[in-house]
Amino acid sequence: MRLPCAILFLITLLSSAPADEGLSKLIVNRVREASVEVLIQGQLRGGGAFVKDSRSRLFVLTAAHLFHTPRDTAIIATHDGRTYFASLSAYDLGHDLALLEVDPVEAAQYGSLKLAASIPNETTPIFNFGPALRRRTLVIPGHVADARISYTDFTSSKGYLAHYFVSGINPVMTSGGIWVNRSGEIVGIQHGRLLAEKGSSGLSMVSSPQAATALIESNTIARTPGLGGYIWEIWTADRALLDELPRNAEGLFVNPVFENGPLARAGIKQFDVIVSCDGIPVRRRHELLAILRSKPAGSSFTFEVVSPGSQGRRPVAFLSEPLEQNWK
């Protein structure tokens, strides 16, 4: 029997319609029960969630920048209004992650959340749970905008945050809050908003589940290779700086250089341009930072550098140092 064209069109349309992208009530309730608010020095700083390692040790996973110093202690508030003491157990400033120790007996009643194996693909719907705008835990939807690892300068660590991008609204106090997929697995931690000229750009910086899992399993202070300054693509420079560089120059200019940091000790000055690292040309910041983070902190590299007003390149020996050693 041949179906009329109109019916065939309707069947095709319905079969291609997107499925409901929301979370089930069961998942929302389970994630809310395992989510917490994090208070430092009596002030609400952001969110977090209960997680377990492979040995069933219980922690709270949150963002490191909620803490003013690693000596701070915290109070966590659960969905039922109870509060519990928590202390910093481990942290990773390169991914802005922190693990908090809590009483495992008291916290066991709230359950814990599993972590996904990897970053979801672009356009995948994911959901942020956190005390946005100082409210009770809200559920804010978003979509993965770029599943590749990006690096953004992060003032709280004076280093770079490795993250992926999520599109959607991102109010204050969402930091430390978890992002979950439709199965309720953690796919990342909220860290901040990429700012536009006026307010938020609508892009969130979210650390990967792989980085969170690594910290949970190691439960140690990370050693993230640091530069001791910030680097920028040369095409973002002011015209005055471009006019002092060789024509068609490519690389990353440095601004600022932090006093007594690795760049300063290597003799690199503000507005110097890093052209290559170990013979590999670097034009975008992720290219250089990926090379630096491919080796342990304390590793040596050779940069090729051009200074404003100079036409020649010079080799510079560079030694990275861990970001975490300067957080006191």
PLM segments and residue spans:
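Conserved active-site neighborhood of the chymotrypsin/trypsin-like protease fold
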Residues: 42-45, 55-138, 163-164, 173, ...
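Gly/Ser-enriched beta-turn/beta-hairpin loop segments
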Residues: 91-95, 147-164, 219-223, 235-251
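Terminal peptide-recognition signature
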Residues: 36-38, 48-49, 57-62, 86, ...
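Protease-domain processing segments flanking chymotrypsin-fold serine proteases, especially trypsin-like
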Residues: 11, 16-45
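PDZ/PDZ-like groove recognition
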Residues: 220-276, 280-287, 291, 306-322, ...
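Active-site region of chymotrypsin-like
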Residues: 32-39, 103-112, 138-205, 209-210, ...
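C-terminal cap/linker of serine protease catalytic domains
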Residues: 21-28, 108, 132, 182, ...
